[in-house]
Amino acid sequence: MLWSSVAHAQRIDTEHLFGFMIGTDVGEPGDKEIEGETVARWGKRPGSYFAAAPAFEAEFVPIENLRASATLSAAYHDISRIAGLEDRRQGAFDSLSFDLRYRLIERQQAGFGLAIDAEPHWGRVDPTSGEPVDRYGADLSLLLDKELVPDRVLAAFNLVYQPEATHSHLTGAWSREATFGPAAGLMVQIEPGILIGAEARYLRAYQGFALEKFAGQALFFGPTLYARLSKRLWVIAAWSPQIAGRAANFSGSLDLTNFERHQAKVQFGLEF
């Protein structure tokens, strides 16, 4: 049952609303929040593949229109009989990241919201293979959202660029890769504090920061649920299967070289 004080809340807040996308809301100056999440990825050929990344985030809004946060994350891999990957079952501390989101246009005033987001990170585990590495990268996003029906239906669009350089501890080699693509989502408030919807992401993987060599592409589409459980506590659950894709130099209707068959996320937040 939802907290009774939420029953009259109608305004849609997009700061935490989607599973794999980002909204343009950033909170109010002085807001503090802690968040926990786990992203799971599974499904590669021909054997068994599962990876999970539990994370803990602390967030603060220092000034109007600016949201800042820091995140610690771990990595777990269970890999067996996957072409090109060593069998392993391991868990380890993985990465540290810092996120800055700045809102350029406020949705309630202009009719649409516009923001930019940058999250540089350092990691010590390869997210696909679980191999020990040093990796340096960033998630850079352009964010747009608009209420199609006030306090009822909201649409969002993201454009994402994710460059990353990786240094292998095993071979000493450096690699430079990037992922680029758009994402779109729609959420409907069916009850005060409860929204359901869907997200679609079209991602292209490249070798090189300047998108020099195409490596593969994937289209993900799946449902998202947001629920405010109390005045201060919320939860998000999303599942995003790959419905189409292709890896470079490989036949088939999916890209299971650069991406997974399924991605899922569960996230909760506690506001102060």
Model segments located where?
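Hydrophobic alpha-helical targeting segments used for export or membrane insertion
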Residues: 1-2, 272
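N-terminal signal peptide c-region/cleavage motif recognized by signal peptidases
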Residues: 4-6
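Transmembrane beta-barrel domains of Gram-negative outer membranes and organellar outer membranes
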Residues: 9-272
